[in-house]
Amino acid sequence: LLSDCKYSTIGNTNVKWDFVELPSQIMENWVSEKEALNLFAQHYETNENIPDELITKIKESKNFGAANMYLRQLAFGYIDMAWHTRLEPVEDVEQFEKEILAKTSLFEKVDKTAISSHFGHIFGGGYAAGYYSYKWAEVLEADAFESFKENGIFHKETAKSFRKNILSKGNL
């Protein structure tokens, strides 16, 4: 969308897989910032901005269940990489997953269930051996968003620099 690439085959989502989720994930940061919320989050009758204490609660709620969500994403990444690095055929998908998930599971696996059978990203969704990019994007976007937090989340020069030096490059 913001790429300056002449050919679409080197822009948009046709970038290095380590980068593919950064543009979408960085955008999620603005939604819980007071300056952004004040642009639209207003009472429908009084037009009062969302109270500061509610904004604080919204930010704090991001930590609720975060460890479990993190482990879940790691599990997906482990399963993805396990399938795409395995050389021998797998006879028992449930057992295969049980061994993989032992590293990340807080709970015992439920019998007769298999994530792989409905986890479209790793086979048909374009993320084969690349599901890790979601977690990696969180690292990249957190680092990139720090510039916006330091300079103001709507700081024009920071935004121009991010677009020019990061988003516009595509796969160059």
Language-model-detected regions and their locations in the chain:
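C-terminal, non-catalytic "cap/extension" segments appended to globular domains
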Residues: 1-21, 26-34, 38-172
